[in-house]
């Protein structure tokens, strides 16, 4: 499970808005094929791990998988049936903030058909709309 080893502050503010597109990480840079987000969202460390397992099980021993996102934002939650007030809740889980255009996973060392199917299985585990991208092809991830 992906979590930060240590953080400066245990709790963060929730963001006001999720506007804009990803500034960096828009191209496939390590592998040959990738999964690119088409909408903004939070992806938990469990969802990242589920997608990774789905891909590696389908690929078997063939290729290499890169995870290009990291869950570095703590999400707090108060216990059930607790009265309001008395401070902010404890950190419950970690999420990676993803904006449109961000390449989240990459694969290399397998044929395109295998990579496409492995990525399709992984996309079902993620809470945002995604698309399959190939290295070198320029594709825009605009919300339409």
UniProtKB/Swiss-Prot annotation:
Identify the keywords attached in UniProt to this record, alphabetized: Ribonucleoprotein, Ribosomal protein, RNA-binding, rRNA-binding, tRNA-binding
Q: Which InterPro entries match?
A: Ribosomal_uL16, Ribosomal_uL16_bact-type, Ribosomal_uL16_CS, Ribosomal_uL16_dom, Ribosomal_uL16_sf
What is the primary gene name for this protein?
rplP
Q: Which SUPFAM superfamilies match?
A: Ribosomal protein L16p/L10e (SSF54686)
Q: Which family does it belong to?
A: Belongs to the universal ribosomal protein uL16 family.
Q: Which PANTHER family match?
A: 50S/60S RIBOSOMAL PROTEIN L16 (PTHR12220), LARGE RIBOSOMAL SUBUNIT PROTEIN UL16M (PTHR12220:SF13)
Q: Where is the stretch described as Disordered? A: 1-25
Name of the protein in question: Large ribosomal subunit protein uL16
Enumerate the GO terms in the molecular function aspect. rRNA binding; structural constituent of ribosome; tRNA binding
Q: Its GO CC terms? A: cytosolic large ribosomal subunit
How does it associate, per the subunit comment?
A: Part of the 50S ribosomal subunit.
Question: Its Gene Ontology biological processes?
Answer: translation
Tell me which Gene3D superfamilies the record gives: Ribosomal protein L10e/L16
Provenance organism:
Desulforamulus reducens (strain ATCC BAA-1160 / DSM 100696 / MI-1) (Desulfotomaculum reducens)
Magnesium among keywords:
no
Compositional bias per record (Basic residues), positions renumbered to this chain:
1-16
Q: Which function does this protein serve? A: Binds 23S rRNA and is also seen to make contacts with the A and possibly P site tRNAs.
Task: Give the Pfam families listed for this entry.
Answer: Ribosomal_L16
Keyword Electron transport set for record: no
User: Span of the secretion signal?
Assistant: none
């Amino acid at each position: 499970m992906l979590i930060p080893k240590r953080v400066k502050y245990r709790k963060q503010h929730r963001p006001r808005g999720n506007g804009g597109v990803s500034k960096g990480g828009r191209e496939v840079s390590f592998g040959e094929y990738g999964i690119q987000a088409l909408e903004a969202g939070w992806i938990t460390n469990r969802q990242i791990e589920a997608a990774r397992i789905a891909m590696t099980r389908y690929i078997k021993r063939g290729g290499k998988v890169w995870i290009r996102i990291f869950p570095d934002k703590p999400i707090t939650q108060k216990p059930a049936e607790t009265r309001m007030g008395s401070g902010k809740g404890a950190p419950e889980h970690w999420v990676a903030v993803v904006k449109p255009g961000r390449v989240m996973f990459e694969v290399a060392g397998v044929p395109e058909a295998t990579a496409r199917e492995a990525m399709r299985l992984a996309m079902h585990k993620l809470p945002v709309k995604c698309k399959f991208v190939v290295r070198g092809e320029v594709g825009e991830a605009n919300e339409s």
